[in-house]
Amino acid sequence: MDISRRSLINATAAGAAAGALAATPEPARAAPLTSTLGRDATQYDVRPNSPDDQTKVLQRAIDAAASAQMPLALPPGAYRTGALRLPNGGQLVGVRGATVLKFTGGASLIASEGASGITLTGLALDGAGIKLADRRGLVHFQNGLDVRVQDCDIVGSGGYGIWFESIAGEVSGNTIRKTANTAFTSFDALGLLVAQNTIQDASDNGIEILRHTMGDDGTIVVNNRIDDIKAGPGGSGQHGNAINAFRAGNVIVSGNHIRNCDYSAVRGNSASNIQITGNSVSNVREVALYSEFAFEGAVIANNTVDVCAVGVSVANFNEGGRMVTVHGNVIRNILPKRPIGTAPDDDAGIGIVVEADAAVTSNVIENAPSFGIMAGWGKYLRDVTITGNVLRNSFVGIGVSVVPGAGTALVSNNLISGSRGGAIVGLDHAKAVTNDLGADGTSRFAQIVLGLNAVR
């Protein structure tokens, strides 16, 4: 019994000593940058905060790290550099908010041609306002797969912020500010996600999803914050938009916060099957949400729009534009005028405009100085339903084209309140040519089918 007790005491003491030894603190060791981010660029004579131009040593370091299939890690500091090229597999990594590449001139700060598996992460890229050639980005990537630009701060580009052409990949978590042209442009995407970026003070468009010819694109543009977009080059709507899809089919634009644009929040031009959903839009000075020209298929749903010249426009049946659902949007505080030169007839002050093969349902529209909802433009009206909407304080609640050749519209189960110019009227283009058709619930025009509507 004594031996067992002695053994137990000795074992306990030894364990306590070992525990105390293990608990003794060791001197703290800073994890080297190379072990956390990649191969340390200072191994290649790259020097942070050097007054010298480091283009040559940076390029040598980028090439060596890519050959070794390692990211190149740039320690905190500023690096003066001209044009750099990312080879296949090139990855350039910095410390977010602390690693700055300052552009000294060249075609682009960082470019690639035909390189896949390339990444920029955690870098501040300062374009210094140096003018770039036309159609050139401070970051300029062409013909690549698995291309990623993430968590970077891009400022002061004298051209485009980021230019992609024939790229598959991701642009996410970046801040792009003060660009002379568009903040982010993609041509002929091969599968692209544009997400959670902050874009401010662009002098053309915020995000452009473009194709050289009409076709499937499939880019997803989600959860971005886009503010202060100017129409620097002028024009009648091709500039000054937060998000612009041109000839790009099957694009999804969802969950974006958009504020203060000279023209539209989202503009789809010949962009079939575009989905514009769940966006928050405020203070845009032309059409807030636009689907126009030669498109087939659009969903515009569950957006909020506060201050615009037109809330939603689905136009150009004469060009083949057709087939849309406009559902569940809240649109208010509509301006009586568009910017000068954008619309020959200045058809502003409207909540929703549609023309062909359209369902307009469950929207709430308030304070439209012209029309709450407008269906058709001259003879360009076909198969439109307007049901279950709430229209408050519009001059005219619902206007429907009644010119010869115009097609059918069903108007039913809407609540129309405070429309001094009439609840439901017939139109010749933007001009009212009938009395209030909703006064007695019947229509003398065969193509207008009136159901039960509440008017007060």
Region spans (language model):
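Extracellular beta-strand/beta-solenoid scaffold signature
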Residues: 103-111, 131-141, 156-163, 178-189, ...
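N-terminal secretory signal peptides and thylakoid transit peptides that target proteins
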Residues: 1-16
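Parallel beta-helix/beta-solenoid
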Residues: 87-88, 96, 114-115, 120, ...
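Acidic Gly/Asp/Thr-rich repetitive segments characteristic of extracellular carbohydrate-active
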Residues: 41-75
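Detector for outer-membrane/organellar transmembrane beta-barrel domains
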Residues: 228, 330-333
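Extracellular beta-strand-rich solenoid/capping regions of secreted or surface-exposed proteins
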Residues: 59-67, 79-93, 100-122, 126-147, ...
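C-terminal segment of N-terminal export signals and the immediately downstream linker at the start
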Residues: 22-44
